[in-house]
Amino acid sequence: MRSAQVYRWQIPMDAGVVLRDRRLKTRDGLYVCLRDGEREGWGEISPLPGFSQETWEEAQTALLTWVNDWLQGSEGLPEMPSVAFGASCALAELTGVLPEAADYRAAPLCTGDPDDLVLRLADMPGEKIAKVKVGLYEAVRDGMVVNLLLEAIPDLHLRLDANRAWTPLKAQQFAKYVNPDYRARIAFLEEPCKARDDSRAFARETGIAIAWDESLREADFTFEAEEGVKAVVIKPTLTGSLDKVREQVAAAHALGLTAVISSSIESSLGLTQLARIAAWLTPGTLPGLDTLHLMQAQQVRPWPGSALPCLKRDELERLL
C-alpha cells in the first residue's frame, strides 16, 4: 500500500552568502517521504536560486502532481531537474538501490584571512584537498592567495571554482601570480571563462587543469577527452534523476576524467544523501559537500559531527 507525505521548509542562512550577485537569506525547499508497505524513502527538492531553471513554487507544483500520480501506481519521473532528483532519491531509498555507506569527508571551502587558512589547512589530517572560490575579487589577488597557500603547505592540493567569472585576460592575470612549479597541485579550476574555448585555451597555455561544471547542463555539451580537461563537477540537484547522474559519472570515468559529486547548498538531509551517492558512484574521490556551515540549522537527518541544531520531521510544514 503506497502512501506519501510532502513537507515544505525554510532554513535561515548565515549572513554573507551571495550567489550570482544575489544575497541568499534563506534556503527554501521540499521533502518527499514515500512509503510502500514497511519501506520508506526520502528525497529533497531544493532548486538553487540563480542556478536552477525552476523556482521553488514551480517545483512544489510539479512534486505534488508527481506524488499523486505515484500514489495511483505511476512509475515515471518528473522533468524538472530538482524534482526528478529528489523523487528518484526517495524511490532509490524505498527500493534499497541507494546504499547506506557514505563518504562524509568534504573538501573544506576556504574563506577568510589567508594566514588563518594556512594554519587551519596545515593541521588537516590525511589527504589535504581544499576548495577556493576565485573570481569574486581581483584576479591578481586570487592568484596571490592561491600561490601563498600552495607555497606554505607543500602537500596541499586545491580545487578552484571561478564560475565563469573571468575574461581570458583576467584568467591570464590570475595564472601569472601562481608559480609554475605549484600549478600541478591545482587539482582543477572549474570553468575559468564564460566561453568553453577560452577555458580550453587557458588550460593549454598555463598548464592549469580545468573542470567542467555549468557546461554539463548545456544542450550542446558532450563528454570528450580533451587536453587540459581533468574533471567534471556534477551537482545532482541541477542535473536531474539519479539515473542521469549515474550516466554522467559513467561517461566521465570512461574517458579517464575525475567525477566529483558536489553540493547545491542542500539541507543536511540532502547532503547526507549526496555523501552516500558519492561513496557509491565515485569511491575514492573526495566529494564537494562542505556547505552545511552556511546554514543555521539541520533537518531530519543530521550530518555526522555537526553541532548545528536539527529539526525533526514534525517541526516541518506538511503539505500532504
Curated annotation (Swiss-Prot):
The active site is at 133 (proton donor), 235 (proton acceptor). It catalyses: (1R,6R)-6-hydroxy-2-succinyl-cyclohexa-2,4-diene-1-carboxylate = 2-succinylbenzoate + H2O. It is an enzyme of class 4 (lyase). Pathway: Quinol/quinone metabolism; 1,4-dihydroxy-2-naphthoate biosynthesis; 1,4-dihydroxy-2-naphthoate from chorismate: step 4/7; Quinol/quinone metabolism; menaquinone biosynthesis. Keywords: Lyase, Magnesium, Menaquinone biosynthesis, Metal-binding. The keyword Lyase applies. Its EC number is 4.2.1.113. Belongs to the mandelate racemase/muconate lactonizing enzyme family. MenC type 1 subfamily. This is o-succinylbenzoate synthase. It comes from Salmonella schwarzengrund (strain CVM19633). The gene is menC.
